[in-house]
Amino acid sequence: MKTFNISQQDLELVEVATEKITMLYEDNKHHVGAAIRTKTGEIISAVHIEAYIGRVTVCAEAIAIGSAVSNGQKDFDTIVAVRHPYSDEVDRSIRVVSPCGMCRELISDYAPDCFVLIEMNGKLVKTTIEELIPLKYTRN
C-alpha cells in the first residue's frame, strides 16, 4: 500500500475527532467520531448515530461528509475516524479505525483524491482512498 508522511495537520485532525467522540460518547448511541479537513483547512467533525437495527446506523464519516456538503464544502483533503471503547471494555484507548466498506465508497464518491488516516500494525498511516477501494465501480 502506498503511504504518505503524517503531518502536524494530520495529527490535529485525529485530535479533533478524538475530542468530538470524547465529548459526545454515549453507550449504544455514539462510539465513533470522525473529522474531515477541506483543502482550505477547515475541519468538520461528527459522531456516528447508532440504532438498534444495525443497518439503520449512520457512520461518523458519512455524517461529517454530509454536514460539510450541506454547508457548501466540496474539496476534501483528509479524513479520519476514531473509536471510543464501550464503558465495559478494559482497554480505554481511543484508536484510529479504518473506514467500513460503505464509507470507503462514500469517501471515494465525494472525495476521490482524499487522503485517509488509518491504523496499521499499531501505527498511524496516511494513504489514499483509492488505495482502500481499488478498481471502484463507476457508472461510466
Swiss-Prot record:
InterPro entries per UniProt: APOBEC/CMP_deaminase_Zn-bd, CMP_dCMP_dom, Cyt/Deoxycyt_deaminase, Cytidine_deaminase-like
NCBIfam families: PRK06848.1
Assigned protein family: Belongs to the cytidine and deoxycytidylate deaminase family.
Chain positions recorded as Zn(2+) binding sites: 59, 100, 103
Protein name per its UniProtKB record: Blasticidin-S deaminase
Reactions mediated catalytically: blasticidin S + H2O + H(+) = deaminohydroxyblasticidin S + NH4(+)
GO biological process, one term: cytidine deamination
Keyword flag Membrane: no
UniProt-listed CDD domains: cytidine_deaminase
Function of the protein: Catalyzes the deamination of the cytosine moiety of the antibiotics blasticidin S, cytomycin and acetylblasticidin S.
Cofactor: Zn(2+)
Enzyme class: hydrolase
PANTHER family: CYTIDINE DEAMINASE (PTHR11644:SF2)
Active site per the UniProt annotation: 61 (proton donor)
Gene: bsr
PROSITE patterns, per the entry: CYT_DCMP_DEAMINASES_1 (PS00903), CYT_DCMP_DEAMINASES_2 (PS51747)
NADP as UniProt keyword: no
GO CC list: cytosol
E.C. numbers: 3.5.4.23
A Pfam family hit: dCMP_cyt_deam_1
Segments crossing the lipid bilayer: none
GO MF terms held by the record: blasticidin-S deaminase activity; cytidine deaminase activity; identical protein binding; zinc ion binding
Alphabetized UniProt keyword annotations: Antibiotic resistance, Hydrolase, Metal-binding, Zinc
Domain CMP/dCMP-type deaminase: 8-140
Source organism per UniProt: Bacillus cereus
